[in-house]
């Protein structure tokens, strides 16, 4: 029950906090639409630490930043726990992150109480397994403060071929 309340709260917070940005539509690409609130800086640092660990291939450090009940959405699929992610895509994600450089192009986020959201856009370019990669990326991460640390409770990744 508590888990459902936390997830519901996270979704409600994400939608509430993002509503002003979403309401503007694509024509309103203003500086305000890409603002990281000061309250979210430490949560964003956790997101950066997660990606840094993946790039180093340090899967233990990466998973230490995930809540046990993390939800990870990618490519139409979902992994419903840290253990499931560890046993399925973690190794491949680390391998890909090590091989293909990424560039953060835009970030926004807010934190309220024990919950935070970080939305990032970027571009990945390089070669992976002998094939060229050039993709625009979008990522939304929801975090929950546990004591003095942020834990990642939800990740949604998507990408599209760059034009």
For the regions a language model picked out, list residue spans one by one.
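Bacterial N-terminal signal peptides that target proteins for export
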Residues: 1-10
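Short beta-strand edge/turn micro-motifs at domain boundaries
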Residues: 24-26, 136-161
